[in-house]
């Protein structure tokens, strides 16, 4: 039969059936959802739509452009996991990429940018005193690498003055994964782009995930 968006097949308000008085029209067609999956085998289909226009239907994706709003920087990064969806838990279980889905992305590109921009390595595990004594040569090597020209040092120093980093984001950098929200529509434009979660929004979703984890642990017990 096919998916139809017309109202001819619907019953009347009184409950009676309507008689089909004309055939279906092309402009009343509906298409099945893309249900874009998180997979390394990237697959995007070209779809010709009304007016000769084109839509890009992403069926499988694993990368996207994500922007870090407070730092005004965007980087292409890997999608690692779908962790939350306000509308449907099934979409989390099946790792489906849709608009407004909360995902975990690889923090490495942003870490690299932060080091280059501010000269600060974030998310690095702090070594214990004993470990520091064991590896003195490594420390010497890093100080040699850190030597920069005078004008670069001045530039970095100037940037340091206005530098602020959310404690929750710093914590995430330690784990190498950042929480982000998809803002594009993968089934319509063929891309999974979005924003890194920050501030109140990040706190909100962290609480949601914590609660979900707690429920899961309770059910397992």
From Swiss-Prot:
Gene3D superfamilies to which the protein is assigned, alphabetical: 3.10.290.70, Ribosomal protein S8e, subdomain
* Location of region: Disordered: 1-40, 126-151
Q: Which GO terms describe its molecular function?
A: structural constituent of ribosome
Bias (Basic residues) ranges: 8-26
Q: Where does the signal sequence lie?
A: none
Q: Name one GO biological process term.
A: translation
Q: Which UniProt keywords apply?
A: Ribonucleoprotein, Ribosomal protein
Q: Which family does it belong to?
A: Belongs to the eukaryotic ribosomal protein eS8 family.
Q: Entry's PANTHER family?
A: 40S RIBOSOMAL PROTEIN S8
Kindly provide the name given to this protein in its UniProt entry.
Small ribosomal subunit protein eS8
Gene name? RPS8
